Amino acid sequence: MNNTLVSHLYDQNTFYDAFLKDLRQAKSLVIIESPFITKKRMQVISSILRKLRARNVHIIVNTKPFDEHESVFKEQVIWAIGVMQDMGIDILFTSGHHRKLAVIDDILWEGSLNILSQNDSCEIMRRIKSKNAVKEMTRYTGMNKWL
């Protein structure tokens, strides 16, 4: 049996095209762990999330509690959380949260890029298509208890 994991690397210039393609094709589950959230990034992604919810895709977003966000961004975070909650997205707040990852069905994205806020920083993300990698990550992070 071949246990080789096939993965691909992306940077801040190539990530969103690939990620949004995966996101649009989600069938049953999306988990996004992003400690930071901005209105600019949410405006790009919210229409896709809305379509996924209309197809009954289970979406979970894990971020920091409101009081851990910088005051300059707090209003944007409150707005974005409200938009997502109105869509029926499950929002989790984890104190001290700093993980940057996503699960889209059997695809795991992990790295340094804040998916819901990235703007002009130099980042890297790895895409792994593997049910086992998804299972391992959701178990390791404790997200499996929300599934």
Task: List each language-model region with its residue ranges.
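A conditional alpha-helix N-cap/helix-loop micro-motif detector
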Residues: 12, 41-42, 91
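Primarily the HKD phosphodiesterase
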Residues: 19-85
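Short acidic loop-to-beta-strand element that houses the catalytic metal-binding Asp/Glu
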Residues: 99-102
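Acidic/glycine-enriched edge-of-secondary-structure segments
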Residues: 1-13, 31-37
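General small-molecule cofactor/ligand-binding pocket signal
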Residues: 60, 89-94
